[in-house]
Amino acid sequence: MKIAVFCSANKNIDPDFFTITEEMGKWMAENGHDLVFGGCNSGLMDCIGKAVKAHGGRTIGVVPTLVERGGRTFPDLDIEIQCDNLSDRKDLMLAQSDLFVALPGGIGTLDEIFTIAAAHTIGYHHKMVILYNMKGFWNSIIALLDDLAEKSMIRGDWRDVIEVADNLEELAKLCEG
């Protein structure tokens, strides 16, 4: 299975996020899942790429020209797919992937989560987004989604489009279930 991972490219974040991300990368490789990601060489993006490669897995990087020109491309990609911008990257990652996992991240990660989820809600695809809620990182987003649903701003149950995993065991069940 091809699992797209959305995550932070920031290096200055909670060190536990790196440890948990390494465990996920190891699990992906050992279970034959390919990594599809933004192809950047910093932060959790770099961490997940290195972990997958260290355990014999395959990496597919969807790399915008701005990242490449800045010398920030992950150096050990098995496949590099170049694109013009972040919108193209999301479209290409959607086409390349079977499901999506969101690790801790910022504005870019939120954009990716909600772009994929919105496309699912109106029927463009039926691929799930899983929030990997390590250390409760996504709790405020989960509360926001619940609040929006309570106010009838979301049609149906948002959990039909976005799942939540609090640990690797839950994540594995959702990915393989």
Model segments located where?
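A cross-family phosphate/adenosyl-ligand binding-site feature
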Residues: 1-96, 132-176
